[in-house]
């Protein structure tokens, strides 16, 4: 395979046995595509799809006035340019957003005209608020901080059938229920109760018999019974009754009388159970009617109203039970035909019939009133109100919407494509009547929808059909950024609609324009609330590139419209078979959110309906093809799918008699010809973080979960180091996260320094007349959300040839374009003097000395000068209470210099606040009268370095309100920024010009001219020497003979002119932005931000971890000479406890250690070759041996000798290996690599004690392992207090480091002191060290006087207790005797 420029520098040797069929997709695609489809900014207005903003507008507009005489129509929307770019928004604390304008049309109708006539039309663009924009890396900048909108996994709209699992009723009876969930609108539930009555409820309110709803939609009792029941027919006569025989209905019944055929032969004797054999005999005998005794008719239910044929009198109502009296009455009236309901206890329950019997409503109006009373208790039901409420519930598009997804799910479930032959007649009749339903349909419910749901539910109760699994991913869908933002925007528009409706009636009389009608405030407020404070809008986790990418790929079941932690049970949190390839079964938080927050699998994506789908390779006739299909969980169930590790022959045929497959969520074995699909990759089931764990298949899942989570907490080291043992996905993560800088176009590197890289673009990639130069500015020492340091370093050199997509610069935690979260350490698994007891970690001093785990953290400290009631605060250097030493670091404006080394308590920004006027003593008055104004009326409120922090000032920013004069420091910062921007532009222009003139030279040298400067003769050929005699810009004066060339020359001249103008304009815009006042919160005059770079070295108490969930705390840093060392004198870096492995079952770490040692050993072998100045051929031979021994082969034939030597040089520190998840290195391959490196194949070696020089008695496992330093640093947790702030009421010290609080001395600690009998210590703890106010003061005085004694009084808690008891109206007082 062809390697890119940076990949060629260091190739990762892969042990993958299967070539990748499908590369990992762009990892941020879900976020970026979702938001792009919401904005549709690049699409011309007339060809926009009805989604996102467009859908929100079209669903609300047109808005008509109440009278219908005026309406406001939506034409199109436009997005403007954002006022500030991302970086400026972050610095100034602004939102990166662009203004949204909508073109709307106000149409006023002519009232006087007989038919609808338009009187006037006004069209106008109206400002609709600001819409936050997504950055290129999929985040948003809101009020200066980067945030991520997490996708939500919610229950899909549609219809769901379930039962209570027998938990409701003591008998354990299954109570079935159905629920119609719309995207917007009221939920409609249907449920059976233990007595088998069917009820419905709206929005979980009071339940009512379902027949009330059926009556409300206009059905009569007869229609209701006909829809949900089959009928039996009887012919009555004076002698008895004849029964129309349907033999199938008798199966399983006990015959209550002899059933005989026309010849008199008894087919079924009395009291015998009727079997299938009997039914066949009845069929053959052709019996249509049989005589039955009256008691066979009694107790049955009449299906239709029975009317006296002569008088027309109603003899019996539908749904009435037949009694002896009624039967006699019917005979007397001469009724011949009687139709009853066919019911039995087994599979034809009389549920609807019995429910109809408890329904007290008489007709449609009464039913609707009953529903109105249930929805609006206490309100009088007027005709309009009842009608409006009922229509608004499920039939009004503005109130109720199933959405396309909901309709698709509803139709698939409620209208099955094929109906079971065993289905009852009434159900078949119903489906024949409504006809087939596709996946499309209205967003509102139709009457037939309600009937279909009740039909399916009744069938479930009858024992036919399956309930739904609500945790199936076919029933849960993903709402991404775009959809969530659209819902919020629509909510804002709905608020606007109400106001517009009110104002539209005035539009005609007051001659209003559209902008007078629309107020953008509600829209802005809705959007602002969503992006600023929604549960799904989260502060981005920016510790390292992996944590960023994982945060954006997260799916949460929490949030508005989702679950809550407390209510979510085990089932929702559990791993489900449909998670395969869609949601990672490993990566989820530990704690209360476990299973509710998940991570997308590497290859997963959402389809247009929002369901997760995963790719599979098509298998036809037992042969694997290259066709790749994405299947959702709904579709996947019907296929037989082989795993990615199934053996495939050379011709692509599946090998082996039986192949391990999945079908309908179960594992099974199938023959090759039964297989329909196959996984695309072994690592398809896991997420990005989990697929970064090498040998994941050898780790216990619980530990793998911790490993995946802890990688996200790894702090970027000062010098990132690629993992020796990786999985091959490291490059994808580094590049897709946006941390490493990628080339936008190919070309030659023209200039490199720490700040920027300039690339001269290839001629074939530069557009005609366009500037062929790309300039990449590096991000230098910037603070991330988690205070880690973001810094980019170029990895290319001048003259390098690069292609599009190559890595140009490394960012935090990346090394040559690969993710590098930690450092490769030489580890030994052995106990060492108890210092690695219980997962503690012993580390060599050399690791600290070499700054291996040193990290830089950037702290932002802010001070604001406000306008107070007593006068404005002032940022100044003149502070009386500060000595010269403290002021030495401040400039004349009172702000610290950049580069100053500061420690806790040092002043960074001097500030004074006016103090309230106090009563002056006569002496002070006299002094003030003599010496004038005294400086005591201000107090020092300067910004100081917080306790426990030392660092270097790396940046200062000053923000000044509009209309307030800037101080010298603020002005100098602006001047510096403008100067550097100007230099930047000048450099860019110079590079652009140089590139353009080099291009012209290549174009015109050797061509003929028609004349030109310095008397160039007509027809003369242009030479390079002639061009050198001219000023660059005079080249354009040469008149070319070739017209085509002349046109190209003119295009370049225009391009340069345009670039110059663009640069001038950019400078003017920048100048305007910098010189205008800053937007600050009300009453803030000035704000200063100081950035400190804090260097954190590794120290005892810091938390460290491997990638396999093996975490521990550094217990001791041991001098190098005391560490165990190998035979050649190499001391180990880290000593880990071997007891941490067996019980936790994360064996992956041991395999990583062995393979890491081989990687390092091979690197040393290459190093020895290079030191011996071996020929390139010999080096090439060794590389061939390493890379092509097993696993994925590499082709070095296209590498020049120079390439080979550069590759070998980069491999000196170790040959990086990739062992992909579930397709990694086998033990024999590791052994082979160890052997090739000349290391013991067992991976164990004799170590010597550094203190005594003696060998340890048995061999120790030694090797290289990638170790991370986690963001739980002891510096952030260490805290000490002597005196400090107290709580106002209880007078006890506050708690926590942030409040500079004390340590809690709790109940158990008191018991401990009691047990020791340490009475005085205990008294001191409970009084003067806590809340004895007078005692505290007294102790202070005593210490000042030098007397070390305690006078303890009464703790303040007693006073609090007295006050609390008094608040209960019990008068109690303390006896202070």
Curated annotation (Swiss-Prot):
Its EC number is 2.7.7.6. InterPro entries: DNA-dir_RNA_pol_bsu_external_1, DNA-dir_RNA_pol_su2, DNA-dir_RNAP_su2_dom, DNA-dir_RNAP_su2_hyb_sf, RNA_pol_bsu_bac, RNA_pol_bsu_CS, RNA_pol_bsu_protrusion, RNA_pol_Rpb2_2. It holds the Pfam family RNA_pol_Rpb2_1. The keyword RNA-binding does not apply. Belongs to the RNA polymerase beta chain family. The RNAP catalytic core consists of 2 alpha, 1 beta, 1 beta' and 1 omega subunit. When a sigma factor is associated with the core the holoenzyme is formed, which can initiate transcription. This is DNA-directed RNA polymerase subunit beta.
């Amino acid at each position: 395979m062809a390697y890119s420029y940076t990949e060629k520098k260091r190739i990762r040797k892969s042990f993958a046995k299967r070539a990748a069929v499908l590369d990992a997709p762009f990892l941020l695609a879900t976020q970026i595509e979702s938001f792009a489809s919401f904005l549709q900014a690049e699409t011309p207005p007339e060809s926009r799809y009805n989604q996102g903003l467009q859908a929100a507008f079209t669903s609300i507009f047109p808005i008509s006035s109440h009278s219908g005489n005026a309406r406001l129509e939506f034409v199109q929307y436009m997005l403007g340019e954002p006022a500030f770019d991302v970086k400026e928004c972050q610095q100034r604390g602004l939102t990166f957003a662009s203004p949204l304008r909508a073109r709307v049309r106000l149409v006023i109708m002519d009232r006087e005209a007989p038919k609808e006539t338009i009187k006037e039309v006004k069209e106008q663009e109206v400002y609709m608020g600001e819409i936050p924009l997504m950055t290129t890396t999929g985040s948003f900048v809101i009020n200066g901080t980067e945030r991520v909108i997490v996708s939500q996994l919610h229950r899909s709209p549609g219809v769901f059938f379930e039962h209570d699992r027998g938990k409701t009723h003591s008998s354990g009876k299954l109570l079935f229920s159905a629920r119609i969930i719309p995207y917007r609108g009221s939920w409609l539930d249907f449920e059976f109760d233990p007595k088998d009555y069917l009820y419905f409820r709206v929005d979980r309110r009071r339940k009512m018999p379902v027949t009330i709803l059926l009556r409300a939609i206009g059905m009569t009792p007869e229609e209701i019974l006909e829809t949900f029941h089959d009928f039996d027919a009887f012919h009555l006569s004076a002698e008895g009754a004849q029964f129309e025989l349907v033999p199938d209905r008798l199966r399983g019944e006990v015959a209550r009388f002899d059933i005989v055929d026309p010849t008199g032969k008894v087919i079924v004797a009395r009291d015998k159970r009727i079997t299938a054999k009997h039914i066949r005999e009845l069929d053959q005998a052709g019996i249509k009617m049989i005589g039955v005794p009256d008691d066979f008719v009694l107790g049955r239910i009449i299906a239709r109203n029975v009317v006296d044929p002569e008088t027309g009198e109603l003899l019996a109502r539908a749904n009435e039970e037949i009694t002896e009296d009624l039967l006699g009455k019917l005979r007397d009236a001469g009724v011949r035909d009687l139709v009853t309901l066919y019911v039995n206890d087994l599979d034809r329950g009389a549920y609807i019939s019995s429910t109809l019997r408890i329904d007290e409503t008489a007709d449609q109006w009464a039913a609707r009133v009953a529903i109105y009373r249930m929805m609006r208790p206490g309100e009088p039901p007027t005709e309009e109100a009842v009608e409006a409420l009922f229509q608004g519930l499920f039939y009004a598009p503005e109130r109720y919407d199933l959405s396309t997804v909901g309709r698709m799910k509803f139709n698939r479930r409620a209208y099955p494509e094929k109906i079971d032959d065993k289905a009852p007649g009434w159900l078949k009749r119903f489906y024949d009547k409504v006809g087939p339903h596709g996946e499309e349909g209205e967003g509102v419910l139709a009457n037939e929808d309600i009937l279909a749901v009740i039909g399916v539910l009744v069938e479930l109760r009858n024992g036919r059909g399956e309930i739904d699994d609500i945790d199936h991913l076919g029933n849960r869908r993903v709402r991404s950024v775009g959809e969530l933002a659209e819902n919020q925007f629509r909510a804002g528009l709905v608020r606007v609609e109400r106001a517009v409706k009110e104002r539209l009636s005035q539009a005609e009389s007051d001659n209003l324009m559209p902008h007078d009608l629309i107020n953008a405030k509600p829209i802005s407020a809705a959007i602002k609330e969503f992006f600023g404070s929604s549960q799904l809008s989260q502060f981005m986790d920016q510790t390292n590139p992996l944590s960023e990418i994982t945060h954006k790929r997260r799916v949460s079941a929490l949030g508005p419209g989702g679950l809550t932690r407390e209510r979510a049970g085990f089932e929702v949190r559990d791993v489900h078979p449909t998670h395969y390839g869609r949601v990672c079964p490993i990566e989820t938080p530990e704690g209360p959110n476990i299973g509710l927050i998940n991570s997308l699998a590497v290859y997963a994506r959402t389809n247009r309906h929002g369901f997760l789908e995963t790719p599979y390779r098509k298998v036809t006739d037992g042969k694997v093809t290259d066709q790749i299909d994405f299947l959702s969980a709904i579709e996947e169930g019907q296929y037989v799918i082989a795993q990615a590790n199934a053996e495939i022959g050379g011709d692509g045929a599946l090998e082996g008699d039986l192949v391990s497959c999945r079908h309908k969520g179960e594992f099974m074995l199938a023959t090759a010809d039964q297989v329909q699909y196959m996984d695309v990759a072994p690592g398809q089931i896991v997420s990005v973080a989990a697929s970064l764990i090498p040998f994941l298949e050898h780790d216990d899942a619980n530990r793998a979960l911790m490993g995946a989570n802890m990688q996200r907490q790894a702090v970027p080291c000062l010098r990132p180091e690629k993992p020796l043992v990786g999985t091959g996905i490291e490059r994808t993560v580094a590049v897709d996260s946006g941390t490493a800088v990628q080339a936008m176009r190919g070309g030659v590197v023209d200039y490199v320094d720490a700040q920027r890289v300039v690339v001269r673009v290839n001629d074939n990639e530069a557009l005609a007349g366009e500037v062929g130069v790309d300039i990449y500015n590096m991000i230098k020492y910037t603070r991330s959300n988690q205070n880690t340091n973001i810094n980019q370093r170029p990895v290319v050199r001048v003259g390098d040839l690069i292609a599009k997509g190559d890595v140009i610069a490394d960012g935090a935690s990346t090394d040559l374009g690969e993710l590098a979260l930690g450092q490769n350490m030489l580890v030994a698994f052995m106990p060492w003097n108890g210092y690695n007891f219980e997962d503690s970690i012993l580390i060599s001093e050399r690791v600290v000395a070499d700054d291996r785990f040193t990290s830089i953290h950037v702290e932002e400290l802010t001070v604001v000068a406000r306008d107070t009631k007593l006068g404005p605060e002032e940022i100044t250097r003149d502070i009386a209470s500060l000595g010269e030493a403290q002021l030495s670091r401040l400039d004349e404006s009172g702000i610290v210099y950049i580069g100053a080394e500061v420690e806790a308590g040092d002043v960074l920004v001097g500030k004074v606040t006016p103090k309230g006027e106090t009563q002056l003593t006569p002496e002070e008055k006299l002094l003030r009268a003599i010496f004038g104004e005294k400086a005591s009326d201000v107090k020092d409120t300067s910004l100081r370095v917080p306790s426990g922090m030392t660092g270097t000032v790396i940046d200062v920013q000053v923000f000044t309100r509009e209309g307030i004069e800037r101080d010298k420091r603020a002005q100098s910062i602006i001047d510096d920024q403008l100067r550097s921007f100007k230099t930047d532009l000048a450099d860019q222009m110079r590079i652009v010009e140089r590139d353009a003139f080099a291009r012209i030279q290549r174009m015109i040298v050797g061509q003929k001219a028609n004349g030109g400067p310095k008397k160039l003769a007509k027809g003369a050929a242009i030479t390079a020497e002639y061009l050198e005699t001219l000023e660059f810009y005079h080249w354009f004066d040469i008149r070319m003979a070739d017209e085509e060339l002349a046109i190209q020359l003119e295009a370049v001249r225009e391009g340069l002119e345009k670039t110059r103008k663009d640069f001038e304009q950019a400078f003017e815009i920048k100048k305007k932005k910098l010189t205008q006042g800053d937007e600050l919160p009300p009453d803030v005059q000035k704000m200063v931000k100081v950035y400190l770079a804090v260097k954190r070295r590794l120290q005892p108490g810091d938390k460290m971890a491997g990638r396999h969930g093996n975490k521990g705390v550094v217990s001791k840093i041991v001098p190098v000479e005391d560490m165990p060392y190998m035979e050649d004198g190499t001391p180990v870096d880290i000593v880990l406890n071997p007891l941490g492995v067996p019980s936790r079952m994360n064996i992956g770490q041991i395999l990583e250690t062995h393979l890491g040692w081989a990687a390092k050993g091979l690197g040393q072998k290459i190093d020895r070759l290079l030191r011996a100045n071996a020929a390139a051929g010999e080096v090439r031979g060794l590389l061939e041996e390493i890379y092509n021994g097993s696993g994925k082969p590499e082709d070095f034939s296209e590498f020049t000798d120079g390439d080979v030597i550069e590759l070998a040089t980069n491999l000196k520190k170790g040959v990086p290996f990739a062992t992909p998840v579930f397709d990694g290195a086998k033990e024999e391959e590791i052994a082979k690599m160890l052997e090739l490196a000349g290391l013991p194949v067992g991976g164990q070696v004799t170590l010597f004690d550094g203190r005594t020089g003696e060998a340890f008695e048995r061999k120790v496992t030694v090797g290289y392992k990638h170790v991370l330093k986690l963001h739980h640093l002891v510096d952030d947790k260490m805290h000490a207090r002597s005196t400090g702030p107290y709580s106002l009421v209880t007078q006890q010290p506050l708690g926590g480091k942030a409040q500079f609080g004390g340590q809690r001395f709790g109940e158990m600690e008191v018991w401990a002191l009691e047990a020791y009998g340490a009475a005085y210590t205990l008294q001191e703890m409970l009084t003067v060290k806590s809340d004895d106010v007078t005692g505290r003061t007294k102790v202070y005085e005593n210490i000042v006087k030098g007397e070390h004694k305690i006078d303890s009084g009464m703790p303040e808690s007693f006073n609090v207790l007295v006050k609390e008891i008094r608040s209960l109206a019990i008068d109690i007082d303390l006896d202070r005797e």
